[in-house]
Structures are given as C-alpha cells and as structure tokens.
C-alpha cells in the first residue's frame, strides 16, 4: 500500500453560508428588527471574548452573487465547541431570516509534506511557526475567497497512487507559488477527508481581490493542480465588521 500522508491538526472550522430572506425581514416592524440585531450583537460580543482569550477565531464577510449573502467563518478547538456555536447561532431570532445555503466542515492542517521541514526536527506542536499555521489569527483583510477541492483518482492521474517522494516534490513546488504571494494573500488550508464532500477547504484573504485571480491562475498551471486537482464552487466576499451589521439590515 502507498504511504499515507500524516497531518498536524489545529482548530476545527465551520464556513456557514447564509442568504438573507429580505421579503420576510421587510415584514418585521423596526422595533423587532432592532431587538434581533441587538441579540446578534451580544452573541458576537461573546464570540469576541473567546477570540481574545485565544480559544478560537471568527469573522464575517458579505458574499457577492446568488450563492449566499453572508459567510460566518468560525474556528474552535473541538467539534463540540464548534457545534455549540452553531447551535447557539441557530437559536437566535434573526437566524429565522438567515437561510442556510452552504456549509463546510474542516480542520486546519499541515501535512508531513511540509510540517517536518517547518519544525526542523523538534516537536512541531511546540514550534511557533507551525502553531501560527494551525491556530491562525484571522487577518482583517478586505476580501475573502473560499473553495473546496480534492485530488484526482482518475487512471494515470491518480494522486493517491504516486510515491510519497513524488507527492512531496509536487507539493513543495506548488507551495513555492503560494510563498511568492506572501504579504499579498494569506491562506488557511482545512483538511476535510471524512468531514465533508471534498478533501480540503481553502480560504484566502487579501486586500486586493485580483490577487485571488492571479494566485489561482498561476497555480492552475502547476502540475499538482493541472493534473491532480478538482475544484468545487468559489465564494468571494467583502469584510463585514460586526459594527456594520445594523447598516446592512437597515431597509
């Protein structure tokens, strides 16, 4: 049997995409709308406390197009904690007007294609660089891009039949492209084999949305992607600070 990749795993991730039911929201009187927005604000304040004590992260982006209106991206140290956030959110009154359109579950990961190199032989979980990747601080960048992807298992283009050494080389070459965008694009890779319909969820952050187009285009021509990658839907959005939520919902 081919050697399986080993991973270092960090925070669990939920990308929760919602569409606003504007027709139903318009039927509410302003007083009820205000009560719901205040309840949402208290919920987000509690999320901020969790973030400040280093036990998780979260952010909200406004999504363009008809796939969704919002994405709530939450990271926690266990599936139980992530599920608790999800359930509490769904119990908010405003959740009745935020219709689920898509979700993705993953765990931030580093594979042994890269992790041993980064750790330099020490316990990787004690390495500051590795920990920063596994338990990332989400940057307040203007734009987000999320997409799921998998590796092919088609005939000669079967990623899982390649020897470990060849996979390592392809991933390192692929990673060189990503590193060339340092300072322009921040990337979080969530492993989702056994968790969701694809094998990874990729989240990109940037202050220039065109950098998403540039990095994805360049990577498409790299062999690891050109021969072996399959992609799901792409979601693009703009940062939505919590203090701007009331403005969004004002009609």
UniProtKB/Swiss-Prot annotation:
Cofactor: Fe-coproporphyrin III
Pathway of action: Porphyrin-containing compound metabolism; protoheme biosynthesis
InterPro entries, per the entry: CHDC, ChdC/CLD, Dimeric_a/b-barrel
Residues involved in Fe-coproporphyrin III binding: 133, 147-151, 174, 187, 225
Coiled-coil annotated residue ranges, if any: none
Co-factor binding comment: Fe-coproporphyrin III acts both as a substrate and a redox cofactor.
Keyword Nucleus: no
One GO BP annotation of this record: heme B biosynthetic process
UniProt record similarity statement: Belongs to the ChdC family. Type 1 subfamily.
Name of the featured protein: Coproheme decarboxylase
Organism (species): Listeria innocua serovar 6a (strain ATCC BAA-680 / CLIP 11262)
Gene: chdC
